[in-house]
Amino acid sequence: MLTFIVTPAAGNGYALKIEEQLKQEMSRRKLECCFVHTDAPGHATQLAKEAVDSGTCSGVISVGGDGTAFEVACGLMNTGMPLGIVPAGTGNDFIKTVGLPKKPLEALEVILTKQPRPVDVGGLNDRLFLNVCGTGFDVTVLGYTQAAKQYCRGLLPYLIGLIRGIAHYKPTHVRFTVDGHTEERDVLICSIANGRFFGGGIAICPEASADDGLLDLVVVEHKPRWQLPFYVLPLLMGRVLKFPFTSHKRCKSIEIFSPGMNLNIDGEIYPMDEAKFTVLPGALSLFW
């Protein structure tokens, strides 16, 4: 039996419409399933654990955005229970890395016909991440964008976030320790990635792989504020590695230290001074 964990608010209610499509298709195929709804942050993790403990579940399916997929993944870590993803959020970034379909019934077809395969999960201090973490200009823009979404919709919050991010930009001074080697610099962007995309499809780590047993570190050096508008479009188009002032490394462990930094962890912002990243190879089973 498949358990579908649905976040009703995902995609401004789009997840509920997808739920009806999934119910109809599962009924048409005469396949046993159950649907449960999340009602608070972290609830999807609890529901995933309950599905595993039930002893009757053969797979747990996330119906929501990247946040729902991440929470469900946390509940399935190292259990062998496979995760399926039916995208229903606004970003749906992780599915792009692993090549999953965006259309709901096509995603369901993958779940019903493909054998699960292992993917890596990132470790960060005492928590996990599935996709991308980082600090710098992009996180500043994300913070302003999230604030703008409280009073406007569509593309306007992103435009407001970008303009305010440029207006208030300051370089982030970061000390890195990468596989034992330490250096310091002022950065525009510092991203640690298991996946390739963030922010609704921006390829911040375009060469990352979710099943290579490594993390990708992309660092864009600090540039003066007046130059930022010239780099925004190439960044949005996924050309970050084309900049001569961008460095890219693959590694097993990364430590970054920057007092008072804001860290993006799979789309959520957390204040901290120090972050230690590791990779957990093949820790999650995924239909893909």
Language model features by range: what are they?
Residues 15, 178, 184, 209, ...:
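ATP/nucleoside-binding phosphotransfer catalytic cores, i.e., glycine-rich phosphate-binding loops
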Residues 149-157, 201, 206-227:
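Gly/Ser/Thr-rich active-site loops/lids in small-molecule metabolic enzymes
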Residues 68-81:
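Short Gly/Thr/Asp-enriched flexible loops that form oxyanion-binding sites at enzyme active sites
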Residues 62-67:
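N-terminal glycine-rich "phosphate-gripper" loop used for MgATP/nucleotide binding
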Residues 1-60:
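ATP/NTP phosphate-donor binding region
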